[in-house]
């Protein structure tokens, strides 16, 4: 795949319609939410990689939209507890196609841009991470996702060898947390509540007690808001003379128009 120049990349990507860019942003957020759903590293790796034969071992932590110098890494994954702790820097690109076509100008421009972003991000971490006694490696990942299905259509780990850095897990976590986009993390933390369902899959309403309270309150508001509701001002029965029963009314009183 021929790598275009930086000027060609900017020119090609600037021609994308605004609607395509908005769709790409939505796909990024949807991908972040999917990543947060996976509790195990093998499941997360199957979602990310197009060739998930050898997933890393250990436990992981996720960071999104991390500012690293003049670049913003889409996602950083720290994997520790295994044989070798690894810091994965992930650059996401989205597309409408189900495969990466080498001759497509937009795809080649996206790839070239992603490789430059990864190179700068890794260089920043290697030279700016707080020093420590643990030997970590920084590994870049370039991933293309389909905007609609979020399936990985292409993945690449550029570079012949991972970049080493000596730090500690605690220091690296603090380093990335301080540079993570707090607004994105807040949006991702807001998970919509699912409605309660019964065994047949139907949405359950409020409990009988709550329905009764709501019904009484609602009925009281309606009565106050109706000026035509008849208000009793006299006794139910009245006699002209003692011992003489009142005559029955010709019909029921009107309770309203």
Curated annotation (Swiss-Prot):
GO terms for biological process: symbiont-mediated arrest of host cell cycle during G2/M transition. Residues 193-257 are annotated as: Disordered. Induction: Expressed late in the infection cycle. The keyword Ribonucleoprotein does not apply. InterPro entries: Herpes_UL24. It comes from the Viruses. The keyword Zinc-finger does not apply. One of its GO terms (cellular component) is host cell Golgi apparatus. It is found in: Virion; Host cytoplasm; Host nucleus, Host nucleolus; Host Golgi apparatus. Keywords: Host cytoplasm, Host G2/M cell cycle arrest by virus, Host Golgi apparatus, Host nucleus, Host-virus interaction, Modulation of host cell cycle by virus, Virion. May participate in nuclear egress of viral particles. Plays a role in the dispersal of several host nucleolar proteins including NCL/nucleolin and NPM1. Since deletion of host NCL/nucleolin negatively impact on nuclear egress, UL24 supposedly acts on this process through its effect on host nucleoli. Induces cell cycle arrest in host cells at the G2/M phase following by apoptosis. The mechanism involves the inhibition of host mitotic complex cyclin-B/CDK1. Belongs to the herpesviridae UL24 family. This is Protein UL24 homolog. It comes from Human herpesvirus 8 type P (isolate GK18). The lineage of its organism: Viruses, Duplodnaviria, Heunggongvirae, Peploviricota, Herviviricetes.
């Amino acid at each position: 795949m021929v790598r275009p120049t930086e000027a060609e990349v900017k020119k090609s990507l600037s021609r994308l319609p605004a609607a395509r860019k908005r769709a790409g942003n939505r796909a990024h957020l949807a991908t972040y939410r999917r990543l947060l759903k996976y509790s195990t590293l093998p499941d997360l790796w199957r979602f990310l990689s197009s060739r998930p034969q050898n997933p890393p071992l250990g436990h992981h932590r996720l960071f999104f939209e991390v500012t690293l110098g003049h670049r913003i890494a889409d996602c950083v994954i720290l994997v520790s507890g295994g044989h070798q702790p690894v810091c994965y820097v992930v650059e996401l690109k989205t597309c409408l196609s189900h495969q990466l076509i080498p001759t497509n100008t937009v795809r080649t421009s996206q790839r070239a841009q992603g490789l430059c972003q990864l190179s700068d991000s890794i260089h920043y971490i290697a030279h700016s991470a707080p020093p420590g006694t643990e030997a970590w490696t920084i590994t870049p990942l370039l991933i293309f996702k389909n905007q609609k299905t979020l399936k990985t259509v292409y993945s690449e780990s550029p570079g012949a060898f991972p970049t080493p850095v000596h730090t500690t897990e605690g220091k690296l976590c603090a380093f990335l947390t301080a540079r993570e986009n707090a607004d994105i993390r807040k949006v991702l933390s807001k998970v919509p509540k699912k409605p309660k369902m019964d065994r047949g899959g139907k949405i359950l309403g409020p409990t009988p007690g709550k329905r009764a309270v709501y019904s009484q309150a609602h009925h009281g508001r309606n009565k106050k808001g109706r000026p035509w509701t008849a208000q009793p001002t006299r006794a139910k029965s009245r006699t002209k003379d003692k011992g003489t029963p009142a005559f029955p009314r010709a019909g029921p009183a009107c309770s309203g128009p």
